[in-house]
A protein has these predicted regions:
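Bacterial lipoprotein signal-peptidase II cleavage site
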Residues: 16-36
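Extracytoplasmic "Venus flytrap"
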Residues: 27-28, 35-59, 76-81
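Short, polar/charged alpha-helical segment
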Residues: 49-71, 90
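Short helix-initiation/N-cap motifs at beta->coil->alpha
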Residues: 72-83, 170-197
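Ligand-binding "clamshell"
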Residues: 103-115, 130, 201, 206, ...
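A conserved helix-loop-strand patch within extracytoplasmic ligand-binding domains
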Residues: 115-164, 263
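A bilobed periplasmic-binding-protein/Venus flytrap-type ligand-binding module shared by bacterial periplasmic
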Residues: 122-133, 234-247
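Periplasmic-binding protein-like
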Residues: 150-159, 257-277
């Protein structure tokens, strides 16, 4: 999931999502029954990259053999996939992580639930001036994203690698005021998309995986520190309306998305480390 300052919006009309008109009132639809026609196509809303790419790999290489008919609808915003899932206009979606979904459900009174983790787009600490973490000293400046989600992730990455110490009990949305010990470092908050452009002006910067790639940085090779996939709350997952996780088609897709074939596809396609597999249950 790539959180940016502005999202291109695909209209409901263009995607054929106007038939019921319920997307404008997502809380109007109750949870699913899990009793859908097993022979019907499973329609999944997804962001184009890597989500739709991964689903297309499953559709073209694994689904037919598994007896699953899969239809992928691409969305470039982060609202319609959930509203369309809640209203039943699509069966599932794959584009988001847990902190985002929790916030979305709370604000919109929706009942979307995660099914299974698939991948992570890791944040990394980068520098054009330092060669390793041990070179980061008091008095130097670190740039971090200024939005709540990515800012909190950045602080956790720094804390996990001993760069800073956070106060006890700081959750996923930590702020600079939650730092217990800055270890003499200065911090500069910037919009996530602009952080790579500041690399020449700071000593180090925490950059989202997608923005690192755009800046021609390789997470696997260039990052001084990189988020770990295991147990990461920012892993992107397959999600459905509550009750539909019992749908046999959903369970089959979840199995395929966590298959050795998909793991190999991710490894072979994203050798730069911008996308890594993060299989398993959502916690």
């Amino acid at each position: 999931m790539k959180l940016t300052g502005a999202f291109a919006t695909i209209t409901a009309l263009a995607l054929g999502l106007t038939a019921c008109g319920t997307a404008s009132d997502p809380s109007s639809s109750k949870g699913g029954s899990g009793k859908a026609d097993a022979s019907a196509p499973l329609v999944v809303a997804a962001s184009p990259t890597p989500h739709a790419d991964i689903l297309t790999f499953v559709k073209d290489n694994l689904a037919e053999k598994a007896g699953l008919k899969l239809e992928v609808k691409e969305f470039t915003d982060y609202v319609l996939p959930n509203t369309a899932t809640q209203s039943g206009q699509v069966d599932a979606n794959y584009f988001q992580h847990k902190p985002y979904l929790d916030d979305f459900n709370k604000k919109n009174k929706t009942t979307i639930v995660p099914v299974v983790n698939v991948h992570l787009e890791p944040l990394g600490l980068y520098s054009k001036k330092l060669k390793s973490l041990k070179d980061l000293k008091a008095g130097q400046t670190v740039a971090v994203p200024n939005d709540t989600t990515n800012g909190g992730r950045a602080l956790k990455l720094l804390a996990d690698n001993g760069v800073i110490t956070l106060k006890d009990g700081v959750g996923a949305n930590g702020k600079l005021s939650d730092i217990k010990d800055k270890k003499g470092l200065e911090f500069k908050e910037l919009e996530a998309a602009t952080v790579p452009r500041a690399l020449n002006d700071v000593d180090a910067a925490v950059i989202n995986g997608n923005y690192a790639i755009e800046a021609k940085l390789s997470p696997a090779k260039d990052a001084l520190a990189l988020e770990k996939a295991e147990g990461n709350p920012y892993a992107n997952f397959l999600a459905v309306r509550k009750g539909d996780e019992k749908d046999a088609r959903v369970q089959k897709l979840a199995e395929l998305l966590n298959s050795p074939e998909v793991k190999k596809y991710i490894e072979d396609t994203y050798k730069d480390g911008s996308i890594v597999s993060a299989f398993g249950a959502v916690k």
